[in-house]
Amino acid sequence: MRKVAFKVNEDLLELLDKYAIKHGLSRSEVIREAIKNMVKEELEKDSIIVARVEKIRIW
């Protein structure tokens, strides 16, 4: 895996740490899952839009 560095404010870091502790995960695991879920959700939205356009074209 490659390393990526970025800055977060104290409030976000506190939320991240609380979530990680509650779920027994590391910060990195929480961040990876959050990014994966966000990207997956966005791609699914795009797929739904494409599917709707294709359905309209078929009719």
From Swiss-Prot:
InterPro entries: Arc_rbn_hlx_hlx, CopG, Ribbon_hlx_hlx
Signal peptide: none
Domain of life: Viruses
A GO BP entry: regulation of DNA-templated transcription
Pfam families from the UniProt entry: RHH_1
Annotated protein name in UniProt: Uncharacterized protein ORF59b
Source organism of this protein record: Acidianus filamentous virus 1 (isolate United States/Yellowstone)
Lineage of the organism: Viruses, Adnaviria, Zilligvirae, Taleaviricota, Tokiviricetes
